[in-house]
Amino acid sequence: MDGSSFLDISLDLNTNPFSAKLPKKEVSVLASTHLKRKWLEQDESASELREELNRVNSENKKLTEMLARVCESYNELHNHLEKLQSRQSPEIEQTDIPIKKRKQDPDEFLGFPIGLSSGKTENSSSNEDHHHHHQQHEQKNQLLSCKRPVTDSFNKAKVSTVYVPTETSDTSLTVKDGFQWRKYGQKVTRDNPSPRAYFRCSFAPSCPVKKKVQRSAEDPSLLVATYEGTHNHLGPNASEGDATSQGGSSTVTLDLVNGCHRLALEKNERDNTMQEVLIQQMASSLTKDSKFTAALAAAISGRLMEQSRT
DNA sequence: CGATTTTGACCTGCGC
DNA sequence: GCGCAGGTCAAAATCG
């Protein structure tokens, strides 16, 4: 996927909405000194405003450049990752989306582009090889197996994995993704000392989405969130009904993760997971930058106001 | 007081 | 058939 296809870096941050409306210095004949003073005051504040706007404009430019750089490095990373993947597991390319069954051949699993299943080195000993395979199998099943009687629709439920960097001291096992979740279970699993938390979307039973969150055994600073299924509703911050309706609301909620998540779901399973990992990391680092989020919020609200005017 | 979380019990599928 | 492990349920506890 081309990074720039979902991130329009030509975004007009709209931080200069008044530039076209600045009063031209037409000298009119002012009859009284009172009026003259008033005009001088206005002129002064206008020049102050202009200065401020210039400053904001240059900041805007810097942000745009920053964004372009981020997209560039995203594309580089993505290409690099694809190259690595095609070199390491060419057979993977030919397989379809795996069915969630315990008997699933581990090699067919496509959901772990990074780390989790590659922490142990390959060993030529058949016994250990088997053991290694078994461990991989277990790890993968950990995130995929579903032993409940499943309906057809559930069987087709999309599974995606998201890695979220967190503080190692944070034991809450919460991943902020814009949706509201209700925890319904927690379990300690065999090959990971940290427990796994089970969440259902708060809109359940109408929304079938579930997620599992567990700290990565290999990198405790990472939370591994596994999503099953797709939301059949908007996020809690969105207006009800039509996703495209902006409804003239002046509130802008930055939900980069969610938006990208939805985009990624349109691709196949493997790409989906890869993209989400990268997107998640990008989004989390961007949303941590308060300046960026503020500027983006201003830009979006500016756009909305502009649209509502036209 | 309703919503949410916790946690032990129970269910289910799989391998032996 | 049995044991194991992951997933879910539901009563109790906690929170806002």
Swiss-Prot record:
One of its GO terms (cellular component) is nucleus. Gene3D superfamilies: WRKY domain. PROSITE patterns: WRKY (PS50811). Induction: By salicylic acid and pathogens. It is found in: Nucleus. InterPro entries: WRKY_dom, WRKY_dom_sf, WRKY_plant. Belongs to the WRKY group II-a family. This is WRKY transcription factor 18. It comes from Arabidopsis thaliana (Mouse-ear cress).
